[in-house]
Amino acid sequence: MFDIGVNLTSSQFEKDREQVVIRAKLAGVSGILITGTNAQESHQAMLLAQAYPDYCWSTAGVHPHDASQWNDAIAEQLHQMANAACVVSIGECGLDFNRNFSTPEEQEQAFSAQLAIAAELSMPVFLHCRDAHPRFISLLTPWLSQLPAAVVHCFTGNRHELDECLAAGLMIGITGWVCDERRGLELRALLPHIPADRLLVETDAPYLLPRDLRPKPASRRNEPCYLPHIIRQIAEWRGEDATWLGQTTDENARRVFRLA
């Protein structure tokens, strides 16, 4: 099983990153993709991935929250980081009109620029979309023929949005959000509609600790070692064998990010 979304650069992991990786391995997690969310974090993610060769890889990009920082110098930094063998995707990039820490115009500029970089380098993109689906799809679609793959990280949309993402050929990342009996029921109902070869799984650690995890960790911090729990729940709701689903989503991740 492969965790395609871990924020291992988070300060919440500052004191025990080594132990977090060890616990993930002991839990049966076969690989981790470390998320880069701005130039500085992407560089740190790259260094962490290099510290765990053939187990950790990373993305390089600018999250929509940080889109106001976008400039030519950052674009050049992403180009340079993308040359590293452990950097396997451009992102996390996209649109977030829920909180608008950067203006919609700034977000669209940074998103389009990163899609252009990914197309130029023929790299997959690691995508973020929240409360912005129509604009997200309209900006993304013209680039899809030039991209080897596109992953919607932490998908939490509705049936219409899922259908549009699938029709566009996107991979769908599912987190422990689906384990939330308050907010995750709509997403849970959509799980059977995602083809197995388009499904990816992720913890988004240290965020989105599964609410149905027992016993709950005292820290309330999510970790990649909880990925097996998420997979078991997804498999149950899809009517599939958990071991098979873990293997299938692992193969999907390695195909999409060209790790095989």
Curated annotation (Swiss-Prot):
Entry's localization field: Cytoplasm
- Judging by the UniProt lineage, the source's domain of life is Bacteria
What's in the keyword line of the UniProt record? Cytoplasm, Exonuclease, Hydrolase, Magnesium, Metal-binding, Nuclease
- Sequence positions that bind a divalent metal cation: 92, 128, 153
Q: What's in the GO CC field? A: cytoplasm
Which Enzyme Commission number(s) are on file for it? 3.1.11.-, 3.1.13.-
The GO molecular function terms of this record are: 3'-5'-RNA exonuclease activity; magnesium ion binding; single-stranded DNA 3'-5' DNA exonuclease activity
The main location class comes to cytoplasm
Subunit annotation: Monomer.
Homology family:
Belongs to the metallo-dependent hydrolases superfamily. TatD-type hydrolase family. TatD subfamily.
Role according to the record: 3'-5' exonuclease that prefers single-stranded DNA and RNA. May play a role in the H(2)O(2)-induced DNA damage repair.
Q: What is this protein called?
A: 3'-5' ssDNA/RNA exonuclease TatD
Q: Which organism is it from?
A: Pectobacterium atrosepticum (strain SCRI 1043 / ATCC BAA-672) (Erwinia carotovora subsp. atroseptica)
